[in-house]
Design a protein with these regions (language model features):
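A short alpha-helical cap/connector motif
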Residues: 1-195
């Protein structure tokens, strides 16, 4: 959902750690998250990594000074093989990749499906949820004791008592690993640990 990341300001301010990094997996698609986190990184003197499978955001945001753009085949493979090499902890993680629903104006859905297929990725809700869970499983050992995970496109279904969408498997995984839901609404959920 557009601009969900902006709901995290108060929680981010509680976990600032200049020795840790901020990371988004899924660079912005004209919704402003990459610029927003870049600005937070600048203010709080932290490194910021924006991980994506295409270089669209990197090409659009050449003016950003605090963003380390990472282009890879999949966020889960990068977090499994390359994240450990950084030798860094993550205090802020934003998960908003593998879009399978609503797209910004100007992006052709058929072209996205073809691009996913070219990379051997099935464009489906289930595959999206598996990818986000794999990313979180890989990131969890690198999360600081005081940290925030922001899950976009993950609404809570009141009548069913469940989370749906991209991070529907991530939320319970984080809860059994010491995280607490501190915000749900506007099509997303924010979890913190140690705050």
């Amino acid at each position: 959902m557009a601009h969900f990341h902006t709901n995290s300001s108060e929680y981010i301010n509680q976990v600032i750690d200049t020795n840790a990094i901020m990371m988004e997996i899924g660079s912005d698609r004209n919704e402003g998250s990459t610029s927003w986190f870049d600005n937070f990184a600048k203010i709080h003197k932290q490194e910021f990594y924006s991980v994506d499978v295409i270089d669209d955001a990197e090409n659009r945001h050449t003016h950003l000074e605090n963003t380390n753009f990472i282009i890879c085949d999949a966020g889960s493979s990068w977090t499994a093989t390359e994240l450990p090499k950084l030798n860094k902890k993550i205090n802020i993680l934003y998960l908003d990749n593998y879009d399978w629903g609503n797209y910004p104006v100007g992006i052709n859905e058929k072209n996205i499906i073809k691009e996913y297929a070219r990379r051997g990725v099935d464009w489906s809700t289930f595959e999206c949820q598996k990818e986000h869970l794999a990313q979180m499983v890989n990131c969890l050992p690198y999360m600081t004791d005081k940290s925030v995970v922001i899950c976009d496109d993950t609404p809570f279904i009141d009548h069913a008592g469940i989370y749906f969408g991209k991070c529907s498997a991530v939320v319970p995984y984080l809860c059994i690993n010491g995280y607490e839901v501190v915000f749900k609404g506007q099509n997303g959920v924010i979890l913190t640990r140690g705050v």
